[in-house]
Amino acid sequence: MTSPLCWAAASNAMPSQDQISTPSKVKATQVQLKPYRSRGKGLVPVWHSLHSKAGPLHASEGKSAVNMQVAELQRKIQLLEGDRKAFYESTQWNIKKNQETINQLREETRVLQLQLTALLQGDEKVVQAVIREWKSEKPYLKNRTGQQALEHLDYRLNEKVKQLNALRHQLGLRQKWLEELQLQHSLRELEIAEAQDSNTEVAKTMRNLENRLEKARMKAEEAEHITSVYLQLKAYLQEESLHLGNRLDFMEAEVVRTKHELEELHLVNQEALNARDIAKNQLQYLEETVFRERKKRERYLTECKKRAEEKKLQNERMERKTQREHVLLQSDDTLQDSMYSKEEELKRRWSMYQMEVLFGKVKDATGVAETHAVVRRFLAQGDTFTQLEMLKSENEQTLLRLKQEKQRLQQELEDLKYSGEALLVSEQKRQAELQGRLKMEEQRRADAQNQLDRTMRALQITKEGLEHLAGKLNHIVVAGPTYEEGSPGASLDTKGSATPQPQETGRSVGKMDPKVDDYLPNLLGLVEEKLLKLHSQLENHNVPEMLRHIVDLEFYATLEGKLPSYNTRIALPVAGHKDKFFDEEESEEDDSDVVTRAALKMRSQKLIESRSKRRGRSRRS
């Protein structure tokens, strides 16, 4: 650590560490460190030249110290970079969280403003809210002011209180009657216990008899079950026995026909095997014969070639000898004669060569090597021609005889057309036609069955859809034939007591019998009437305002669904407006938990079901 380079690096590193506080400063430090490194590298040879007598020990120590300083500075820079990234991520997360809080507060502010406007609208708003909530009271509250609506509701409330008091009175009477019946039951049980204690033998006998009776009943049920199974088996076997004879005959005929076919195939197979063996033997004999003939021809050709070569050499020697003799004694006249003789000799040799070529082609065509054999072959061609002419005449006579036989057989076939065999053939053809028609009819039946199945499925889907729609529209009452349960003008409560109720006219799905043939048309008519009534009721409402409200809700739900997965919802302890239909028992979940979209849908569904149940109970009461 005694080198000036180390002191310079240390002095430059200390202010750089003090200056690092932000990501921009980190980059500045990195820029500042680069010249120091290059400067240090440039100073090393100078220091070495100045202190060359000290040896390489001081130089190596200086380099290691500089490297350590640089490595330490790099680690610090990396730590500062990590701190910068963490600070940036935490800042972004705080920004997103604050943005979510702002959006939530805006939504709550909008809801509170809507509630405030709803509260400031007065009596007309109250009347409209009551009409929307209680559709059964709509005809009575439609054209009334707030005070008149309150008076009407007070009157109805007094009626309901009176009915409640009457029901409570009936409940007290029923409870007293129930207590009396329980007392009588306990007395009867005491009497039975005393009888069992006094007559133990009789009780044992009764229990034994009951056990035997139960066993006999179980055995009888099992016997009935076994009897029914055996009867089913008997009916199935009887039905099978009706077609068993025909099936056995058909199967026997099939077996006989298959046996005949098998025998014929065995014969054909044996003939084919014999023909194959004969063909193999003939092929082997022909191959051996051809091989021997080829060997013979090759030997003869080699001998002929040798003889031709020898003759050629002899001719060449004779020509050279004659040429030498003629050269010594030639003259002009003798030269012309020799030229003429040479031309004659060349023509003779050319004709001999052509004859040899033709003879070679004839030998190749006939497969014979000797000249006299070729001559015999050509002479034998005449005998072969005459023999072929004889065979031709014989074949023509045979063909004429076969044609006459064919005409005779054709005439016999024409005569046998109306015999038993011809009738059998016609019956077989007719059977084939009927089978074809049967297949066509079966195909038509299968198509009709498929179409019927599709129609039944469509009808079932339509029925289920209409029943579902009718269930949704069950709270709507339409005009129809009157129905009575019990006495006129009275209805039974859950305990079975009769209470005075106004006679109600209307139709509902529960009063229709699904087993009736006209159930589906009646259900369709009922649903149509309810939909028309619902449409007439919707005409009195502000439909664009309702649609705008629904579109706003869907828009907010879409925005909520597009939030990223890492977005966390923070529940703020804000006291919200409690609904008058809010059920405390169904909202016992912890408010600190994160409410997901699925949980919110489940809560809203439960709230809607609780409201519909309360409305149904209020209508039934």
UniProtKB/Swiss-Prot annotation:
Component of the outer dynein arm-docking complex along with ODAD1, ODAD2, ODAD4 and CLXN. Interacts with ODAD1. Interacts with PIERCE1 and PIERCE2; the interactions link the outer dynein arms docking complex (ODA-DC) to the internal microtubule inner proteins (MIP) in cilium axoneme. Residues 484-514 are annotated as: Disordered. Expressed in trachea multiciliated cells. The keyword Cytoplasm applies. Residues 61-325, 386-470 form a coiled coil. GO terms for biological process: cilium movement; outer dynein arm assembly; regulation of cilium assembly. It is found in: Cytoplasm, Cytoskeleton, Cilium basal body; Cytoplasm, Cytoskeleton, Microtubule organizing center, Centrosome, Centriole; Cytoplasm, Cytoskeleton, Cilium axoneme. This is Outer dynein arm-docking complex subunit 3. Its main location: cytoplasm. GO terms for cellular component: axoneme; centriole; ciliary basal body; ciliary rootlet; ciliary tip; cilium; outer dynein arm docking complex. It comes from the Eukaryota. The keyword Membrane does not apply.
